[in-house]
């Protein structure tokens, strides 16, 4: 498709995530597209790949990101490329840009989710301990009073 259209008639280039990988195993390439409107799943629409992002945690619970900062600075600075929100989040976490506000919101939600899970586990443990104490007290009462 890129060869059919004259490049000077494209709009502003866009930096975004292109989905690669398999079913239930996403893998993203951080790519430069000639325009925001063109599809992100077609390899023919990619001008340049400037990084990769693996969203699934590995054995050490890390999400791997590889970025070519030199090429990103070129596309952002000299070519005035538009940057998608997910890429802005990655660039904020990598230190090239300030941290995106959406990252703070996501971290707050994750902390609240973990706190809720810990409260549920503590409540279940307290309930189990209470049941065990009741069983122990009824069992002790039954053995101390022979009939």
From Swiss-Prot:
One GO biological-process annotation of the entry reads: mitochondrial translation
Subcellular location, principal: mitochondrion
Give the record's GO CC terms.
mitochondrial small ribosomal subunit
KW Mitochondrion (keyword) present: yes
Indicate the segments annotated as coiled coil, or none if absent. Answer: none
**Superkingdom of the source species:** Eukaryota
* Keyword presence, Mitochondrion: yes
User: What Gene Ontology molecular-function terms does this entry list?
Assistant: structural constituent of ribosome
Could you list this entry's UniProt keywords, alphabetically sorted: Mitochondrion, Ribonucleoprotein, Ribosomal protein
- Pfam families per the UniProt record, alphabetical: Ribosomal_S16
Matching entries from InterPro entries are given as: Ribosomal_bS16, Ribosomal_bS16_dom_sf
Subcellular location(s): the record lists:
Mitochondrion
- Gene3D superfamilies from the entry? 3.30.1320.10
Similarity comment: Belongs to the bacterial ribosomal protein bS16 family.
Q: How does it assemble?
A: Component of the mitochondrial ribosome small subunit (28S) which comprises a 12S rRNA and about 30 distinct proteins.
Identification of the protein by name:
Small ribosomal subunit protein bS16m
Q: Species name for this entry?
A: Caenorhabditis elegans
What's the gene? Answer: mrps-16
């Amino acid at each position: 498709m890129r060869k059919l259209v004259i490049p000077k008639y494209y709009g502003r280039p866009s930096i975004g995530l292109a989905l690669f990988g398999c079913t239930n195993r996403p893998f993203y390439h951080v790519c430069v597209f000639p325009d925001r409107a063109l599809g992100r799943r077609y390899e023919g629409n990619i001008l340049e790949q400037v990084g990769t992002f693996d969203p699934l945690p590995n054995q050490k619970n890390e999400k791997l990101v590889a970025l070519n900062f030199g090429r990103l600075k070129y596309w952002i600075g000299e070519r005035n490329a538009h940057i998608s929100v997910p890429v802005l989040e990655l660039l904020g976490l990598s230190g090239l840009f300030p941290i995106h506000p959406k990252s703070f919101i996501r971290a707050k939600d994750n902390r609240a989710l973990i706190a809720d899970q810990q409260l549920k586990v503590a409540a279940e443990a307290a309930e189990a301990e209470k049941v065990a104490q009741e069983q122990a007290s009824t069992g002790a009462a039954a053995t101390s009073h022979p009939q």
